[in-house]
Amino acid sequence: IKNGYPRDS
């Protein structure tokens, strides 16, 4: 998570 999404690694 970096953008606010649960799978945005």
UniProtKB/Swiss-Prot annotation:
Tissue-specific expression: Expressed by the venom gland.
S-S pairs: none
Keywords associated with the record: Secreted, Toxin
Example of a GO MF term: toxin activity
Chief place where the protein resides: secreted
Localization (cell): Secreted
Gene Ontology cellular component terms for the protein in this record: extracellular region
Record's protein name: Toxin To40
